[in-house]
């Protein structure tokens, strides 16, 4: 059964994005998890188009997004301006934040509990 919340991983590296995706999919098989890493031409970096595709292709209407560096966050915020999805952005470590969130979504945890837990690992 599809969950109402999904997880989106955004990294400057396609290998990092795919690796985080693979790790969290193991513990959250029912959660829609999408990712984008690198630029369209395979270089290190991020782009609006790949970030937009990762967010829009997620099956959930509400997505928690996790990123590695500043321009990834900037692209998420830009997509947020045009997307009809509810985009939830925390400044949490990409692996730990995504893993903890996906596990809690898998267990049908309430969004306010997920948010409270993410705040404990948030990077300020």
From Swiss-Prot:
Tell whether Acetylation is among the UniProt keywords: no
Example GO molecular function term? phosphoenolpyruvate-glycerone phosphotransferase activity
Q: Name one GO cellular component term.
A: cytoplasm
Instruction: Pinpoint the PTS EIIA type-4 domain residues.
Output: 4-124
Q: Which UniProt keywords apply?
A: Cytoplasm, Glycerol metabolism, Kinase, Phosphotransferase system, Transferase
Against Gene3D superfamilies, the record matches this protein to:
Phosphotransferase system, mannose-type IIA component
List where in the cell it is found: Cytoplasm
**Which EC main class describes this enzyme?**
transferase
Main location (coarse class): cytoplasm
Q: Which residues form the active site?
A: 12
Q: Which GO terms describe its biological process?
A: glycerol catabolic process; phosphoenolpyruvate-dependent sugar phosphotransferase system
Establish whether keyword Magnesium is in the entry: no
> What EC number(s) has UniProt assigned to this enzyme?
2.7.1.121
Coiled coil start-end: none
From what superkingdom does this record's organism come? Bacteria
Report the catalytic activity: dihydroxyacetone + phosphoenolpyruvate = dihydroxyacetone phosphate + pyruvate
Q: Of which family is this protein a member?
A: Belongs to the PEP-utilizing enzyme family.
Q: How does it assemble?
A: Homodimer. The dihydroxyacetone kinase complex is composed of a homodimer of DhaM, a homodimer of DhaK and the subunit DhaL.
What further fact does the record state? Unlike the carbohydrate-specific transporters of the PTS, the complex DhaKML has no transport activity.
Q: What is known of its domains?
A: The EIIA type-4 domain is phosphorylated by phospho-HPr on a histidyl residue. Then, it transfers the phosphoryl group to the EIIB type-4 domain.
Q: What does this protein do?
A: Component of the dihydroxyacetone kinase complex, which is responsible for the phosphoenolpyruvate (PEP)-dependent phosphorylation of dihydroxyacetone. DhaM serves as the phosphoryl donor. Is phosphorylated by phosphoenolpyruvate in an EI- and HPr-dependent reaction, and a phosphorelay system on histidine residues finally leads to phosphoryl transfer to DhaL and dihydroxyacetone.
Q: What is this protein called?
A: PEP-dependent dihydroxyacetone kinase 1, phosphoryl donor subunit DhaM
Gene designation per UniProt: dhaM-1
């Amino acid at each position: 059964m599809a969950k109402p919340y999904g997880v989106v991983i955004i990294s400057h590296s396609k290998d990092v994005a795919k690796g985080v995706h693979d790790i969290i999919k193991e513990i959250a098989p029912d959660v829609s998890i999408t990712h984008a890493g690198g630029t369209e031409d395979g270089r290190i970096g991020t782009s609006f188009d790949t970030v937009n595709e990762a967010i829009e292709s997620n099956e959930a209407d509400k997505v928690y997004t996790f990123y590695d560096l500043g321009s990834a966050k900037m692209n998420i915020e830009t997509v947020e301006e045009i997307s009809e999805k509810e985009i939830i952005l925390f400044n949490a470590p990409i692996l730990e934040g995504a893993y903890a969130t996906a596990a809690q979504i898998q267990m049908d945890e309430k969004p306010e509990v997920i948010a409270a837990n993410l705040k404990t690992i948030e990077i300020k």
